A protein has these predicted regions:
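Acidic, metal-coordinating helix/loop segments flanking the phosphotransfer/catalytic sites
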Residues: 41-46
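Structural signal for conserved beta-strand scaffold positions within catalytic alpha/beta enzyme cores
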Residues: 5, 37, 53, 68-71
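Conserved acidic residues
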Residues: 49
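Ser/Thr/Gly-rich flexible loops in soluble cytosolic domains mediating phosphotransfer, phosphorylation
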Residues: 66-93
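Short, polar loop motifs at secondary-structure junctions
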Residues: 39-40, 52-59
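Short, well-ordered coil/turn elements that cap or connect secondary structure elements
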Residues: 30, 62-64
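Conserved active-site segments centered on acidic
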Residues: 2-39
Length: 93
């Protein structure tokens, strides 16, 4: 499975989000997941299963069903809850 963490520039918040996603996955006992952080402009060419991004970027992803939106990218427990909800809904858990 591949998860990409996306922000406007692909540096600050996406890197923090990547670390939160990795922590959440570890807590969930999910292994063998490739997690990357990228900018919104460079993500289109990347293969991925799930996109994780901040709630602020909701308008950047209209009509997509592969996106998990998170309000606070620093809080691993919030990221974990959002990922669990998404993965259960998609039959990935």
């Amino acid at each position: 499975m591949k998860i990409i963490c996306v922000c406007g520039m692909g540096l600050g918040s996406s890197l923090i989000l990547k670390m939160s996603v990795e922590t959440a996955l570890k807590q969930m006992g999910i292994k063998d997941v490739d997690v990357e952080h990228v900018s919104a402009g460079t993500m289109e060419g990347l293969n991925h299963d799930i996109i994780v991004t901040a709630e602020d970027f909701r308008d950047e992803f209209p009509g997509r069903d592969d996106v998990v939106f998170v309000r606070n990218v620093v809080k691993a427990d919030e990221v974990k809850a959002a990922l669990e909800e998404y993965m259960k809904a998609k039959g990935l858990l």
